[in-house]
Regions:
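Bacterial Sec-dependent N-terminal signal peptides
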Residues: 1-33
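Short, compositionally stereotyped local motifs that mark structural "simplifiers"
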Residues: 497, 501-656, 673, 682
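Active-site neighborhood of glycoside hydrolase catalytic domains
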Residues: 269, 274, 286-287, 292-387, ...
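Feature activates predominantly on carbohydrate-active enzymes
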Residues: 98-321, 362, 366, 465-469
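Surface-exposed loop/turn motifs at beta-strand-loop junctions within extracellular Ig-like
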Residues: 120, 587-591, 733-735
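Flexible, acidic glycine-rich loops studded with aromatic residues
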Residues: 373-379, 384-389, 395-543
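Aromatic, loop-rich ligand-recognition surfaces of beta-strand-rich domains
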Residues: 638-701, 708-758
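Acidic, contiguous N-terminal accessory segments
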Residues: 28-158, 368-377, 381, 385, ...
């Protein structure tokens, strides 16, 4: 009996020990769901702080943040929270002795209370954001486990941008955008207020900027929009609305940086005041995307209006910066403008690039006199950088490197890692987006400080910014979708706690954060669960390879076009593609599909999987899967050119297909693209040749521009039946973009996807 009792005690001790280990592991996991992850977090074993009952917040040195915290806690916990001079949840001001530790704060939790020590008002706000995430995480248990956090930001500039010109978003929607930034400790909001497609800020001294420039003709993308006036689409912010948004941002410790574009992207302004152009107009507010040739003419009337605009802008925005654009300003009109050419001579300038530099420097001098500094896109480097300018490096990291080495500050927002208008998953299962791809892991991998900089130069890198251009984003739910979850990766990069080896941990925290987004009814992409498909060729056969970043899920697929279910085949190895088929695949967790279905159509012809030789290489940005792209049985998506297309700039496609052995055929088919706003044009002619020896070719069919223009992008060439081993296809590009079109005189782009032989 005594022995039995002893065994029972031993078992109970083991159960209690295992329970403690489970509890402690759960606590540790829960606290590591913070985004961005703090610089230093230590879990204590000293109990927890209760969240039940009435709570008291002691304001201490940070009354504003204490009030904010009390209000947020009442909403979260549905309980009374009292604000007093002191209390178990309390604030204290401390000195930050390390300059590199921006917005330093400490957060300590134990059974006696919650202690926040912060170096600045913004640091106290960020401590509150961390605490609120902890409260949300532990709300169900009724207490927050004891812990200690010592945290700070690596970068002083942690920015996000929203383009409200291409598509307009209300002041309340902008406030929501600010809410999202503040949760993840972002502190700069770049408000893109003017562009070719709309002028969005009220300027009382020049009312036509909004009366005319804020509205454009309705196009298909906005035909159902409520944001219309007199049959036109658009809108603008009154100065009172702007003041309200700025005050709202200030409470969230976010600085709003307004952008007034110059000298390019000015067609909305020129529609209102055509006399500010080189030609005199008339102009319409832009209804298409791309780069417009008509820009501000650098004459006194132009500078007078822009100075009036700046006078009103500086009274609305307390920001240290005004962004003046400076990007994508074609010199087409300036080259043929008598006034511009006279100004080049008068000012002793070398060319139109130096004229742009003159334009920017003149406006910088005026803005500096108002106590502000300018930011410009990296094109402001052309012709010489303005003395006090900060460079926003978007075309790559080179602009930031150049600026930092010259002693100028730079903000890193390269198109490769920071453009949120790009697809974040497979274009076939994602909403329409710009023609490129930017997945969550690539955002997370970005290091804002280029390795080319030494320690002193690196101090000029203020931080990263992600840009939300809205050509294809017509409503705010779509903005949310493109923002989340990539904003989470951006926040960790900007805070300085992203690490390549920690991506898996970050990914798990993102998935955990989806529950919060669901509760708040925030729209977000689930591309993190999506499958990736890759076409491979082995020993003359084609296969479709599937992969997923969530290795604990099961991939199931079908080849008959039906949707996959839990009864569908389990993917174990690449699927053989030996006939025309549709493969549908998806991730499954237990009996539930997670993410979207990956669909891939294959259309097999006699050329599928064969060897191809090109006379001219495609542009390095649009090489897709090389020559295999032309014979993989997959048609390209005309909204996404990075995959399944070959792109040529100023070159023909001349492709010779080795059919391996002589075969009979009488048709060749290919797809091409005509998107003139993107400088992409249909070819001028297509010719098909055949050969037995790859030396002597015979022309069997050709079509010209008239037929191609009627083809709707699919060119079919039929001819008498041939029996040959080699097929050569020549696709002749448009030599120069015609006058009157964007990019006039430049080489046209040519895009071709599949060369099908039947």
């Amino acid at each position: 009996m005594l022995l039995l009792l002893k065994d029972q005690i031993t078992i109970m001790r083991k159960i209690l020990f295992l329970s403690f280990i489970f509890f402690y592991s759960s606590v540790l996991f829960a606290q590591k769901n913070l985004i961005p992850m703090p610089q230093h977090l230590e879990i204590s074993k000293q109990g927890s702080f209760p969240l039940k009952g009435n709570l008291t917040v002691g304001a201490g040195a940070f009354e504003t943040q204490a009030k904010y915290l009390a209000n947020q806690l009442e909403g979260l916990l549905q309980t009374k929270v009292t604000l007093k001079k002191s209390g178990p949840i309390r604030f204290q001001k401390i000195n930050n002795t390390v300059s590199e530790k921006h917005d330093y704060y400490e957060l300590k939790i134990d059974p006696s209370g919650v202690f926040i020590a912060a170096s600045t008002e913004s640091a106290a706000f960020y401590a509150v954001q961390t605490l609120l995430q902890l409260v949300e995480e532990n709300q169900a248990s009724g207490s927050i486990p004891a812990l200690e956090i010592k945290d700070y930001a690596k970068f002083t500039y942690r920015g996000a941008h929203l383009d409200v010109s291409r598509h307009f978003f209300t002041a309340d929607e902008v406030k929501l955008f600010l809410d999202y930034l503040s949760r993840y400790k972002m502190n700069k909001f770049h408000w893109h207020l003017t562009d070719d497609q709309g002028w969005r800020i009220e300027i009382k001294s020049h009312p036509k900027l909004t009366a005319i420039g804020a509205y454009r003709a309705v196009t298909d993308d906005v035909k159902d929009s409520k944001l219309t006036k007199d049959g036109r689409y658009g809108g603008f912010y009154t100065q009172e609305q702007i003041k309200d948004v700025v005050a709202y941002a200030n409470k969230l410790q976010i600085e709003i940086i307004p952008e007034i574009e110059m000298p390019g992207h000015a067609q909305a302004a020129l529609a209102a005041y055509p006399e500010l152009s080189c030609t005199g107009g008339p102009f319409q507010v832009g209804t298409t995307w791309g780069v417009m040739d008509d820009i501000y003419c650098p004459k006194e009337e132009t500078f007078a209006l822009l100075e009036d605009v700046i006078d009103e802008v500086v009274t609305l925005f307390p920001s240290h910066y005004i962004h003046i654009g400076g990007d994508e300003a074609p010199k087409t009109r300036w080259k043929t403008c008598a006034h511009c050419q006279e100004m080049i001579k008068k000012e002793g300038l070398k060319d139109e690039f130096e004229l742009q530099s003159y334009f920017i420097k003149r406006m910088e001098k005026y803005i500096n006199a108002k106590g502000k500094d300018i930011i410009g896109w990296d094109e402001i480097l052309e012709g010489g950088l303005a003395p006090n300018a900060t460079v926003m490096s978007w075309t790559g990291i080179e602009g930031g490197i150049h600026a930092a080495k010259a002693g100028h500050d730079a903000i890193m927002t390269p198109v490769s890692h920071m453009y949120l208008d790009y697809y974040q998953g497979n274009p076939q299962s994602e909403p329409l987006a710009f023609n490129a791809e930017l997945r969550l892991d690539k955002v997370y991998s970005f290091n804002p400080i280029p390795k080319e900089l030494n320690a002193q130069e690196a101090k000029h890198i203020l931080g990263p910014q992600a840009n939300m251009w809205t050509e294809y984003i017509t409503n705010f739910k779509h903005v949310e979708y493109m923002l989340f979850p990539r904003l989470l990766a951006l926040s960790e990069v900007a805070w300085g706690t992203s690490k390549p080896e920690a991506y898996k941990s970050f990914e798990n925290r993102v998935i955990h954060e989806f529950a919060y987004l669901d509760r708040k009814k925030i729209n977000y992409s689930k591309a993190i669960f999506e499958l990736n498909g890759n076409i491979i060729s082995r020993n003359g056969k084609m296969y479709y390879e599937l992969s997923t970043i969530k290795n604990d899920n099961t991939i199931r697929y079908t080849t008959d076009g039906t949707a996959p279910t839990v009864q569908s085949a389990v993917y174990k190895e690449p699927v053989v593609v030996d006939r025309t088929m549709t493969i549908n695949a998806a991730n499954f967790s237990a009996a539930r599909m997670v993410g979207s279905v990956l669909k891939q159509d294959f259309v097999i012809s006699k050329s599928t999987g064969k060897s191809v030789q090109l006379l001219y290489e495609p542009n390095e940005a649009y090489q897709s899967n090389g020559t295999a792209t032309l014979v993989d049985g997959v048609y390209g998506n005309k909204q996404y050119f990075k995959k399944n297309w070959l792109g040529f700039n100023g070159k023909d496609l001349v492709a010779t297909i080795d059919m391996a052995e002589p075969v009979s055929f009488s048709n060749v088919e290919l797809n091409v693209v005509d998107q003139n706003a993107s400088w992409i044009y249909y070819p001028q002619a297509v010719k098909v040749y055949v050969s037995q020896d790859n030396q002597n070719f015979t022309l069997v069919q050709e079509v010209g521009k008239e037929v191609i223009d009627k083809s709707k992008g699919t060119i079919k060439l039929s001819f008498e039946k041939q029996h040959a081993k080699f097929v050569k296809v020549e696709v002749q590009h448009l030599n120069k973009i015609p006058a009157g079109s964007g990019g006039a005189g430049s080489p046209a782009w040519l895009f071709v996807d599949e060369l099908s032989v039947y």
